[in-house]
């Protein structure tokens, strides 16, 4: 009986790790696809990765694109993207991302993620640290 409990515990642990890994990959994939869309000024496609609440705030991809160009130029024109830790903050999944922009300035951003019926979406982005050099 003790061996069965240990086996079930190990099985549960590994299935949780695998699920978390899959979420990590899916979340990073969404962020990567949005950043790739920004690189070619495809704001329509980039807007598809935004959560319903973000879509409601901006209304359309044109307004969303203006906000990104003005407020997040390092996301609009990136040079290097490195994924850091996926954290749970106040019940929300937050993917930390280190971005090097085209001027070789380094930024740490927090991508707040939400799971919807259509998959993972980006609910918001905050700049954790201004340029690191």
Model-derived features: positions:
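Short solvent-exposed beta->alpha transition segments
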Residues: 28-29, 33, 43-90
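Sec-dependent N-terminal signal peptides
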Residues: 4-15
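Short, low-complexity N-terminal intrinsically disordered segments enriched in polar/charged residues
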Residues: 14-40
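Exposed beta-sheet edge and beta->alpha loop/turn motif
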Residues: 85-133
């Amino acid at each position: 009986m003790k061996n069965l409990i240990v086996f079930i515990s190990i099985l549960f642990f590994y299935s949780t790790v695998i699920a978390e890994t899959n979420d990590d990959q899916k979340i990073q994939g969404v962020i990567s696809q949005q950043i790739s869309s920004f690189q070619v000024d495809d704001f329509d496609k980039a807007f598809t990765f935004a959560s319903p609440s973000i879509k409601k705030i901006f209304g359309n991809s044109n307004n969303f694109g203006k906000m990104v160009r003005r407020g997040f130029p390092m996301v609009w024109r990136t040079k290097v993207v490195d994924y850091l830790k996926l954290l749970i903050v106040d019940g929300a999944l937050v993917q930390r991302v280190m971005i090097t922009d085209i001027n070789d300035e380094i930024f740490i951003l927090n991508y707040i993620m939400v799971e919807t019926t259509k998959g993972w979406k980006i609910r918001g982005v905050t700049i954790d640290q201004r340029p690191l050099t």
